[in-house]
């Protein structure tokens, strides 16, 4: 080992064995002197009747979750306390100029400020961090905490809703005459009167309000909620049991939901499915898929409704906005099933089962189509007279019969020749081949004419069903559009342009 190595070893041993620095000795001596006769179980006041003022402010770090189903808000906060402890004063000159000292918080008296409306039974802070002591006796303590607080969810306009959640803090043990809990920004307080529901009905109560009661300087923005306002309200209430008032500071967190997620995943699909209801009436009845489409739409809406039930709390106070829209759409789909059954019944009617009333033909065949912009196509070769084909067949048949009978005039009775121009004749009474042929041809002609008439009636029934489909198509399209606008547009947050604080 060379001389340089010996020198390094001496320096290292000196550093290890050297006593603490002067500052550390002073801080250690100060801590021992302060804690020597200190009783952390006793309220730090010089006289028993003296009131200890504790200033308190909430610093919101993160809004972790707002659980609508369980009505619980989870937050990550810092609880900023400050008070004067006369037992923790010292003269910096006597302790080497030490003006600030950090001590474990479990070695000094602490105010038992807890969250009253917690939802999981955890009233205390998460970590007992160190407290900051100043030579004049000021104690500052800002422990972090993750709280689950109760929050009554208003689902009336979900998912375009705004919520108001509260966090109520107060001393669990001391009354207002022993510990006066005040907001740290007391200089910004304003006094107002507030209506409060009491045991004997609504009463007026004096409340001290700080508009920006929560510190949002280190807030991490939420992906689901905008914070609109964070007032802090100080209440001083007296109860018949006690002489001392009980003081609490209630922080209100006004939230507005960011609607993009629910708009894309819930609103748009619901609106699209509702408009499919109208398209049912655009399908041809011969396809046989109208009822199937209606039932499929109804099942889809039921799935969305079950999804909504899993999200919102089980409340019977009000129906949420999206729930009203889904119910409205389900009613429309149910009506579309009923109407589709009626139109299919009309579509498949025939002369053997139903007789078409004259008013129905005039209304649905002659009157309504021109107002619905519908034009019925004419069959090929159709002219002004609908039964011209049968008239020509009858004329051909008459000419043929007259030709045959003209060559066999002895078979005709005298009345036949005299009335030939009226196409009436009398066949002989015997069963001649000519008589049988004429009767057969006449029967065939009548049968063809009846078939054509029946076919025309069937086509009229089908056309009436098409007209009904057009009427219901227009009606349901208008109903879907009108219902969508009226129901969705009722949400006040759609028109809310209030800038978010965070």
From Swiss-Prot:
UniProtKB keywords: Cell membrane, Disulfide bond, Glycoprotein, Ion channel, Ion transport, Ligand-gated ion channel, Membrane, Postsynaptic cell membrane, Receptor, Signal, Synapse, Transmembrane, Transmembrane helix, Transport
Null mutant phenotype: RNAi-mediated knockdown causes a resistance to nicotine-mediated paralysis.
Residue ranges, Extracellular side: 24-263
Cell compartment(s), UniProt: Postsynaptic cell membrane; Cell membrane
First and last residue of the signal peptide: 1-23
Cross-referenced InterPro entries: Neur_chan_lig-bd (IPR006202), Neur_chan_lig-bd_sf (IPR036734), Neur_channel (IPR006201), Neuro-gated_channel_TM_sf (IPR036719), Neuro_actylchol_rec (IPR038050), Neurotrans-gated_channel_TM (IPR006029), Neurotransmitter_ion_chnl_CS (IPR018000), Nicotinic_acetylcholine_rcpt (IPR002394)
Glycan-bearing residues: 136
Biological function: Alpha subunit of nicotinic acetylcholine receptor (nAChR). Probably acts in cholinergic motoneurons to regulate presynaptic neurotransmitter release, thereby ensuring normal level of excitation of cholinergic motoneurons during locomotion. Involved in nAChR sensitivity to nicotine and levamisole.
Assembly information from the UniProt record: Component of nicotinic acetylcholine receptor. In muscles, composed of 2 non-alpha subunits lev-1 and unc-29, and 3 alpha subunits unc-38, unc-63 and lev-8. In cholinergic motoneurons, composed of 2 non-alpha subunits acr-2 and acr-3, and 3 alpha subunits unc-38, unc-63 and acr-12. Interacts with lev-10.
Family that this chain belongs to: Belongs to the ligand-gated ion channel (TC 1.A.9) family. Acetylcholine receptor (TC 1.A.9.1) subfamily.
Protein name per its UniProtKB record: Acetylcholine receptor subunit alpha-type unc-63
Organism phylogeny: Eukaryota, Metazoa, Ecdysozoa, Nematoda, Chromadorea
């Amino acid at each position: 080992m060379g001389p340089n190595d010996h020198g390094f070893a001496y320096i290292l041993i000196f550093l290890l064995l050297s006593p603490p620095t002067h500052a550390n000795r002073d801080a250690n001596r100060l801590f021992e002197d302060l804690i020597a006769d200190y009783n952390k179980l006793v309220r730090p006041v010089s006289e028993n009747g003296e009131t200890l003022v504790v200033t308190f402010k909430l610093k919101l770090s993160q809004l972790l979750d707002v659980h609508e189903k369980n009505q619980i808000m989870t937050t990550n906060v810092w609880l900023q306390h400050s008070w004067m402890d006369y037992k923790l004063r010292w003269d910096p000159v006597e302790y080497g100029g030490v003006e600030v000292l950090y001590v474990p918080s479990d070695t000094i008296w602490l105010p038992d400020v807890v969250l009253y409306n917690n939802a999981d039974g955890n009233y205390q802070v998460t970590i007992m961090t160190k407290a900051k002591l100043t030579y004049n006796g000021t104690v500052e303590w800002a422990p972090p905490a993750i709280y689950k607080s109760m929050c009554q969810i208003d689902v009336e306009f979900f998912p375009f809703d705004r919520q108001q959640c509260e966090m109520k803090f107060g001393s669990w043990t001391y009354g207002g005459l022993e510990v006066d809990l005040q907001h740290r920004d007391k200089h910004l307080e304003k006094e107002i009167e507030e209506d409060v529901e009491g045991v004997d009905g609504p009463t007026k109560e004096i409340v001290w309000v700080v508009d920006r009661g929560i510190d949002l300087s280190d807030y991490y923005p939420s992906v689901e909620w905008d914070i609109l306002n964070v007032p802090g309200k100080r209440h001083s209430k007296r109860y018949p049991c006690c002489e001392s008032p009980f003081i609490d500071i209630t922080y209100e967190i006004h939230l507005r939901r960011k609607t993009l997620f629910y708009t894309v995943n819930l609103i748009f699909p619901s609106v699209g499915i509702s408009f499919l209801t109208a398209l049912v009436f655009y399908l041809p009845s011969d396809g046989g898929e109208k009822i199937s489409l209606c039932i499929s739409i109804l099942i889809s809406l039921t799935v969305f409704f079950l999804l909504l039930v899993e999200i919102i709390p089980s409340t019977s106070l009000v129906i949420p906005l999206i729930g009203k829209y889904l119910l409205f759409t389900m009613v429309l789909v149910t009506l579309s099933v009923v109407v589709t059954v009626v139109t299919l019944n009309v579509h498949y009617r025939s002369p053997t089962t139903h007789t078409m009333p004259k008013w129905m033909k005039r209304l649905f065949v002659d009157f309504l189509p021109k107002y619905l912009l519908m034009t019925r196509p004419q069959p090929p070769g159709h002219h002004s007279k609908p039964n011209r084909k049968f008239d020509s067949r009858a004329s051909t048949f008459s000419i043929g019969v007259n030709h045959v009978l003209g060559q066999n005039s002895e078979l005709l009775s005298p009345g036949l020749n005299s009335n030939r121009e009226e196409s009436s004749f009398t066949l002989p009474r015997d069963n001649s081949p000519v008589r049988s042929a004429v009767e057969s041809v006449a029967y065939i002609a009548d049968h063809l004419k009846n078939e054509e008439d029946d076919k025309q009636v069937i086509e009229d029934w089908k056309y009436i069903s098409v007209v009904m489909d057009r009427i219901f198509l227009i009606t349901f399209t208008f109903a879907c559009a009108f219902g969508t606008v009226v129901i969705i547009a009722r949400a006040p947050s759609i028109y809310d342009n209030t800038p978010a604080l965070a």
